[in-house]
Swiss-Prot record:
GO molecular-function term, one example from the UniProt record: nucleotide binding
Name by which UniProt lists this protein: Nucleotide-binding protein Tcr_1902
Lineage: superkingdom: Bacteria
Record bears the keyword Lipid metabolism: no
Keywords for this protein: Nucleotide-binding
Keyword Nucleotide-binding: yes
Physiological role: Nucleotide-binding protein.
CDD domains, sorted: YajQ_like (cd11740)
Organism: Hydrogenovibrio crunogenus (strain DSM 25203 / XCL-2)
Lineage, top ranks: Bacteria, Pseudomonadati, Pseudomonadota, Gammaproteobacteria, Thiotrichales
SUPFAM superfamilies cross-referenced by the UniProt entry: YajQ-like
Family indicated by similarity: Belongs to the YajQ family.
Gene Ontology annotations for the cellular component aspect, listed alphabetically: cytosol
Amino acid sequence: MPSFDIVSELDQHELTNAVDQANKEVTTRYDFKGTDSSFELKESMVTLKTESEFQLQQMLNILIEKANRRGIDVKCMEVKDPEIQLKTAKQVVEMKEGLDAPLAKKIIKAIKESKIKVQAAKQEDTIRVTGKKRDDLQAVMQLLKGMEDLDMPLQFNNFRD
């Protein structure tokens, strides 16, 4: 019976590359000369450190641009509120990964409402979709790609015939 998995994964290697490129740009840009500005990656949290709120916004734009170039979807970035003090400004960007319960329910509900003859079941942080025909599974993929209101990027893997 054909099946595939719906996941939301983040390529950690590409994230590291994006942060490294952003750090490189900040060190070479003229408007950041003489400032102690940097990006720091720990697990799935990117910390932006600089001296002013304006520079913090510029750094966030740099990070988003570099992440886009590396193929990381901006939807998986959760930007926290900036912490601005006298001479330092800091902001944390959390990189979300995996399908949480509300999003999984929303996806399963959309699949069931589409009346396509498949079964969808949540397994940890993935959703397994099984059906009798490969065409039905491809129709589900197209349905999910067309959904605009998903706040996480989805990938389809483990396709078995």
